[in-house]
Amino acid sequence: MPDQRTLLQVDGVTKVFPGVRALDNVTFSVLTGEVHGLVGENGAGKSTLMAVATGALVPEEGRVVIDGVEAVGDTEKARSLGLAIVRQEPALMPELTLAENLYLGVPEAERPSLMDLSGWAQRLLEQWSHGVAIDTGTRVLSLNPEERFIVEIVKALAAKPKVLVLDEPTEHLLAEDVERLFERIRRITASGCGVVYISHRIREVQKIANRLTVLRDGQGQGTYQAAGLSEHQIVELIVGRAMDREFPAKSADAASDIIFEVESLSGTGFSNVSLKLRKGEIVGLAGIDGNGQREFMRALTGLIHSRGRAMLNGRPVSLRSSRLCAQAGIVFLPGDRHSEGIFAGLSVRENFSIRSLGLDSMHGLVSRPSEARRTQLAIREYAVKTPSIETDVASLSGGNQQKLALASVLANKPKVILIDEPTQGVDVGARGEIYEVLREAARHGTAIIVVSSDAEEVAGLSDRVMIFSRGHIVKELHGDSVVESNITTAILTATAHRERGFDRVGRFWKWAAGDWAPILILAVIIFVLGLYASHVNESYLSARNLSGVLALVATLAIVSYGQQVLMLAGGIDLSVGPLMGLVVVILSFYLTDGAPVADQATGWTIVVVAAFAVGVLNWILVDPLGLHPMVATLATFMGLKAISLILRPMPGGLISESLTDGISTTVGFIPLAVIVATVAAVILEFVLYKAKLGLALRGVGSRREAARMAGIMPRRMLFTAHVSCSLLAAAAAIPLMAQVGTGDANTGENYTLAGIAAAVIGGASLFGGRGSFVGALLGALLLTQINVVTTFLNLDDAWQSVLLGAMILAAVTVYSTSRQKVVAG
């Protein structure tokens, strides 16, 4: 169109990593109203180019202009100028709800009031599809991959971008959602938005793109009109050579022996499935996601409990565990390469040998030369491109990671290979190599079962295809009928009667994984324990006893709030106990009877400054310097204890009695301190779930990098969390001071672990992103109650430790198990 203007211009960009020139003088542009396809093999530089465009990476040379404004190396500026990106791996925070992720994912100007968050999110989802059945209050961790990707797309569209980058947007989408995506792309481009469409699926690019740019080895290979190139020409531009055939010739013998057989196999997501597999045969499992084919495959490798009969080489084989299956010769290569297929952080050598260590070991000791020799042979045989066998596997391209994983699986010469999405996220050149590896394994007698969402891939690879619907095999294709059109037709015919997914989690576990479960569970336990104690000893419910219990609760509750703040951000602080002791020691010099007001003010000022300084020190050690939180705060623990002992080698310095009496004031039998602690818990709980600060804090703890992409500053949030933790610990020392009445360097030490325990029992996650201040308050009440109840029941001190340990173990078990059960694949 003559009035088109340039929305995104990347000029002469060069980006160099150690030993690699990822981008070499690349130029790329996106016009108003166009879809610009970006294609190339894995490692060609597509993701690096988009990282430069979005400001996530700073190039050595070149510039980025968004809607006429230069923006290099600034993600926030790129977002504010109207650039949004949908990444191949959704940048979502798993512990936050769907609605909260949408809220943080859009610019400030597009955000609603937090009070209308759920309704706003529901309206956005309905713009995607009126029939969408995703609860906006659902935590992202419990969404399946397709639902997570829909949320990521909806989030990007809600930002009303001028330029939308889509990176492999259809990998996890059902067919109907792919069509919805294309319809939305057409709609936003009609209104002037420019779209960058990155995909390995060349037919999709041809279908949706106006222009396309090809990258190869970090260099542009030209920009073309999409309609002017055939699929074959695009492939040749991508790989730099002619591609005669994508799929190797099929060679299965229909008369070969049956090697693997299952009869009437049933499990979660599938039922009464029977299948026979011959030597050297590749069988494809096809169907819309959620119809049981993946669950069936995982059951065959022992990852999902199943019922039925399985035979390998005519003998019964147990499918109870993946270990037993592997020992029998049944191996599995999962589709989620990053989570289950490779061991990120380990080398190429370790990733290859880890599945076949028996070939390199004797008497439990691994022979490094043997391991290295086998790895070198494997990377040559399977054409794995890697600088060395000691390279971190995470740095390899997706295709090379997949080839290495395949080589690792084949090293033990398995009888049956189960492979889920063999080429997902793999470039077109590596696909052909992977297909050849699978077919070559079949020629040597290995039986293979493949699950793929790509009907063309299933048709090209498979000798037979089983169509799944509603957890059953509803049709079998073999011989000349194994073609893409027949597979697609069979799938679409079957889906008219299919059920979308299966409910795998019981009601109790769903409830236990919620935010209110810890609070209700603790309330019931506290009530029952109190009822029992009062039945055994009537004086338990006396005003004097209850007042004493609640006074102790206030101190523990406030320090547990500090731990809770930090744990929400993914941290922990072992120094809070000695800090409380130091506060009491400092105040014992300034808050004595008859001390001038100026001296008292000086004491309070020193305490605030000291607590702030401790928080800053812990933050510096943990964040900028990168020490583990437990190591860093343990060092602070010892330093604070040393300072307290230097100041007060022996207990001394009586705190003003009038001051301690004031702090110990009660309303009826309820101490003022516990009233303050309760009000503080309610306020902090409100901030946690209804204020931007709480949302940002949980976001950082849930997934730091995703939070950063959403515009949150993780370093700033961690600074806030560390300082808040120390200040709350100092505040907790005030009621503690009233209880001990003198400066003692050992005061407060027990509150380090007790504060953590109260937060954990109250529902905090040790991994960050989740917690409750009301839960921490009840956790503090329960821990204090246990200590008191054992005394009233005439139990010795050992029972205190037993009961406390049992409570912590039970809480962690219930919360962790429930949260794991609701996590979707």
Where are each of the predicted segments found?
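Transmembrane alpha-helical segments in multi-pass inner-membrane proteins
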Residues: S453, G615, A729, Q739-G805
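Alpha-helical transmembrane segments within multi-pass membrane transporters and channels
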Residues: A595-F637, L778-G779
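Single transmembrane alpha-helix segments in multi-pass membrane proteins
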Residues: V35, F527-V536, Y540-G594, I620-L627, ...
